[in-house]
UniProtKB/Swiss-Prot annotation:
UniProt-listed Enzyme Commission number(s): 4.3.3.6, 3.5.1.2
Role summary: Catalyzes the hydrolysis of glutamine to glutamate and ammonia as part of the biosynthesis of pyridoxal 5'-phosphate. The resulting ammonia molecule is channeled to the active site of PdxS.
InterPro entries for this protein: Class_I_gatase-like, PdxT/SNO, PdxT/SNO_CS
Name of this protein: Pyridoxal 5'-phosphate synthase subunit PdxT
Protein's pathway: Cofactor biosynthesis; pyridoxal 5'-phosphate biosynthesis
Keyword Cell membrane: no
Alphabetical list of PROSITE patterns matching this protein: PDXT_SNO_1 (PS01236), PDXT_SNO_2 (PS51130)
Family designation: Belongs to the glutaminase PdxT/SNO family.
UniProt signal peptide: none
Species of provenance: Archaeoglobus fulgidus (strain ATCC 49558 / DSM 4304 / JCM 9628 / NBRC 100126 / VC-16)
Encoding gene per record: pdxT
Gene Ontology cellular-component terms listed: cytosol; glutaminase complex
């Protein structure tokens, strides 16, 4: 199994390491590569869009053709995961900040997102969440977005303060938090198996 981590910004190396550990725990022989170029995602079995700044990441993936490769992978039923800014990019609708910056979204998750949903005063925090299919998970939030609305085909996996912070639509997984910043690989393991269950 080959997993691509789109290495434009964010916790790229942490995602690479967490995914390698998850593959090992699942007993799957695999390779995890960080990429900033077209051609790698299209030859992969799964892809991760890490956090960072959503406007910058959007410009780069759409101008370099990586966005088309992510869309194709999702269409093929392969696992796609976005964390923090990656969640924003996976979503169909953004808030006024997303619209004001003309950030192009992939539209793979029928959801509306709000940037910096928990306010600037809570830029970084960690809370235990009850994540469906995973169980209790210590989630790290950093200037996190949240999902405010979902379509009928989206399954809510976790909420915090009445906002959705994890959701799934078939093989696409969106998280407001950073699972790669913990030693717990269960969310990466769940992600890697999404192609089997979608």
């Amino acid at each position: 199994m080959k997993v691509a981590v789109v290495g434009v910004q964010g916790d790229v190396e942490e995602h690479v390491l967490a995914t390698k550990r998850a593959l090992k725990r699942l007993g799957i022989d695999g390779e995890v590569v960080a990429t900033r170029r077209r051609g790698v995602v299209s030859r992969s079995d799964a892809v991760i869009l890490p956090g960072g700044e959503s406007t910058t990441i959007s410009k780069l993936i759409f101008s370099d053709g990586i966005a088309d490769e992510i869309l194709q992978l999702a269409e093929e039923g392969k696992p796609v995961m976005g964390t923090c800014a990656g969640l924003i990019l996976l979503s169909k609708y953004g808030d006024e900040q997303v619209e004001k910056t003309n950030t192009k979204l992939l539209g793979l998750l029928d959801a509306k997102v709000k940037r910096n949903a928990f306010g600037r005063q809570r830029e970084s925090f960690q809370v235990p969440l009850d994540v469906k299919y995973v169980g209790k998970f210590d989630a790290v939030f950093i200037r996190a977005p949240a999902i405010t609305e979902v379509g009928k085909d989206v399954e809510v996996l976790a909420t915090f303060e009445n906002l959705i912070v994890a959701a799934r639509q078939k093989n696409v997984l969106g998280l407001a938090f950073h699972p790669e910043l913990t030693d717990d690989t269960r969310i990466h393991e769940f992600f890697l198996k999404l192609g089997e269950t979608s």
